C-alpha cells in the first residue's frame, strides 16, 4: 500500500478520527503490516503485544465467549482495533484470524501518536491556538458523538451564534470522515434558540460512505431537544472540468481599509453621526470577534438609516491556522453567518424602529480549496423579502479573484420583540 492509501484507511478507524490530520500522516509512516492465515493466532493470552493493531482486511475472533448471542460483539473486522493504547495497559486475550487477515500495527514506541490536545493540531497546545480554533474544538464523547461549548469570548448575541452551530456541527461531521474527503456542500436548519450556558451535544449519523463521496447528518442537542440540524456532503479531490463566470467586484484592497475595531473608534468621535448613536456605541460592551472584518464601503449610515440590501467586506481568521483544509472550511462556515442575514434588513431600517433578523436555514457550496486565515471577499446581496422572510445570497472570492464559496440563507425579518426564554421555538 502507498502512503495515501494507508492514510485513507486510518481515517476510517473510529479511534483515530478524533486526531488531527497531521497525526494520521505520522502514524501512516510508522505502522507495520502483518499478515495471518485462517486459524493463526494474532496474539496469545500470555504473549506481549507489539502495539496497537488496526484490521485492514479480514476478520478475527476474540476467544472466550461461548454464548451465541454475544459472539458477534467479539468478532473483529475492517477498521476495528485492539492492543496497546495510550495507557500502556497490556490486555490478556487470545485473538485468532477467522480468515486471511492483514493488520497494520502501530509499534508500542509510537503509541504516543494517539494522544492529542486538539482535534485540529497535535503540536500546539489548545491555549496557544487561535480563538476561532478553540471555539471549534470539540470533545469526542463516544463514537459519532461530540460535545461543544460556547466560550466566554465567543460571539453570542444573547444566544448561541448561528455560525457556531454551523462550524461546530461541520467539525463533528468532518471528524467522522477520512480526511482525504472534504466538505463540498452543506444545508442546515436552525430550529430552536441555543443556550450559551450549557454544552451542545452533536450526534453524527453516517448516511453514506463511498469511494469518492460521503454524507453525514448532524443533530445538535440541548436539554434533550434537537435545536439545529446539518446535512453535509464530502468529496475526495478529483480532476475535472473547470470554468468561472462570476467576477469579483472591484473593491479596495483590505490593507487600505479600517479594521472593525478602528472603525468603531472612528465612529464614536464622528460628528456626522447622531449623538445618541455615538453614545450607545461608546457605552456598549465591545468584545472583539475572532474574525477580522474590513468593510469595503464604510459609510455614515447607522442601524436606523435605510440603505441598499447589499454589502461587501473582507474577512479572515485572527491568528494562523494549521494546514488542515477541514479546519479552514469549518472556520469559513463559522464566519459566514456574521452580518449575513442582517443585510436583508437594510432597506427597512428607520429611526425609532428596532428590527431583528433570525436565521432560518443556511446553505454553502465550497468550490475550491481556501485558507480562512488569508483575506476572503464576502459579497452579500438580498434580492427579496416577503411575508417576514428575507432571502440573502453570498459569494466569497480569494484575492486572486477565484470564486471559492457560494451561500444562501433565509431569515426571519421583523420588528424586534422582547426575548423569549431559551429553548423556545425561533418562530
UniProtKB/Swiss-Prot annotation:
The active site is at 337 (charge relay system), 359 (charge relay system), 409 (charge relay system). It is found in: Peroxisome matrix. Mostly expressed in leaves and flowers, and, to a lower extent, in seedlings and siliques. A motif (Microbody targeting signal) lies at residues 425-427. Optimum pH is 8.5-9.0. One of its GO terms (cellular component) is peroxisome. Homotetramer. Belongs to the C/M/P thioester hydrolase family. This is Acyl-CoA hydrolase 2. The lineage of its organism: Eukaryota, Viridiplantae, Streptophyta, Embryophyta, Tracheophyta. The gene is ACH2.
Amino acid at each position: 500500500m502507498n502512503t495515501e492509501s494507508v492514510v485513507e484507511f486510518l481515517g476510517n478507524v473510529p479511534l483515530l478520527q478524533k486526531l488531527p490530520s497531521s497525526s494520521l500522516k505520522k502514524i501512516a509512516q510508522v505502522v507495520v503490516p502483518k499478515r495471518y492465515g485462517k486459524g493463526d493466532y494474532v496474539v496469545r493470552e500470555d504473549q506481549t503485544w507489539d502495539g496497537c493493531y488496526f484490521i485492514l482486511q479480514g476478520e478475527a475472533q476474540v476467544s472466550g465467549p461461548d454464548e451465541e448471542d454475544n459472539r458477534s460483539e467479539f468478532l473483529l473486522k475492517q477498521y476495528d482495533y485492539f492492543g496497546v493504547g495510550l495507557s500502556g495497559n497490556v490486555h490478556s486475550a487470545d485473538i485468532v484470524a477467522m480468515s486471511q487477515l492483514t493488520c497494520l500495527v502501530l509499534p508500542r514506541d509510537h503509541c504516543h501518536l494517539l494522544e492529542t490536545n486538539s482535534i485540529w493540531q497535535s503540536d500546539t497546545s489548545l491555549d496557544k491556538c487561535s480563538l476561532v480554533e478553540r471555539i471549534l474544538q470539540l470533545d469526542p464523547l463516544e463514537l459519532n458523538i461530540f460535545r461543544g461549548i460556547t466560550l466566554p469570548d465567543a460571539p453570542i448575541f444573547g444566544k448561541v451564534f448561528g455560525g457556531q452551530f454551523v462550524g461546530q456541527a461541520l467539525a463533528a461531521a468532518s471528524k467522522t470522515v477520512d480526511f482525504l474527503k472534504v466538505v463540498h456542500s452543506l444545508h442546515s436548519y436552525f430550529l430552536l434558540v441555543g443556550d450559551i450556558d450549557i454544552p451542545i451535544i452533536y450526534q453524527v449519523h453516517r448516511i453514506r460512505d463511498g469511494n469518492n463521496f460521503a454524507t453525514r447528518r448532524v443533530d445538535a442537542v440541548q436539554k434533550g431537544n434537537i435545536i439545529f440540524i446539518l446535512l453535509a456532503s464530502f468529496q475526495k479531490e478529483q480532476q475535472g472540468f473547470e470554468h468561472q463566470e462570476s467576477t469579483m467586484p472591484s473593491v479596495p484592497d483590505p490593507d487600505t481599509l479600517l479594521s472593525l475595531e478602528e472603525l468603531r473608534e472612528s465612529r464614536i468621535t464622528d460628528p456626522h453621526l447622531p449623538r445618541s448613536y455615538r453614545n450607545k456605541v461608546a457605552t456598549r460592551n465591545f468584545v472583539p470577534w475572532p474574525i477580522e472584518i474590513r468593510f469595503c464601503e464604510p459609510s455614515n449610515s447607522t442601524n436606523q438609516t435605510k440603505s441598499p440590501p447589499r454589502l461587501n467586506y473582507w474577512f479572515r481568521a485572527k491568528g494562523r491556522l494549521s494546514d488542515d483544509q477541514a479546519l479552514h472550511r469549518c472556520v469559513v462556515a463559522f464566519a459566514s453567518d456574521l452580518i449575513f442575514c442582517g443585510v436583508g434588513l437594510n432597506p427597512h431600517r428607520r429611526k425609532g424602529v428596532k428590527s431583528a433578523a433570525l436565521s432560518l436555514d443556511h446553505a454553502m457550496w465550497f468550490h475550491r480549496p481556501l485558507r480562512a486565515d488569508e483575506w476572503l471577499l464576502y459579497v452579500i446581496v438580498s434580492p427579496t423579502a416577503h411575508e417576514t422572510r428575507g432571502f440573502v445570497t453570498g459569494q466569497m472570492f480569494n484575492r486572486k479573484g477565484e470564486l471559492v464559496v457560494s451561500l444562501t440563507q433565509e431569515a426571519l425579518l421583523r420588528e424586534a420583540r422582547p426575548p423569549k426564554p431559551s429553548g423556545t421555538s425561533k418562530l
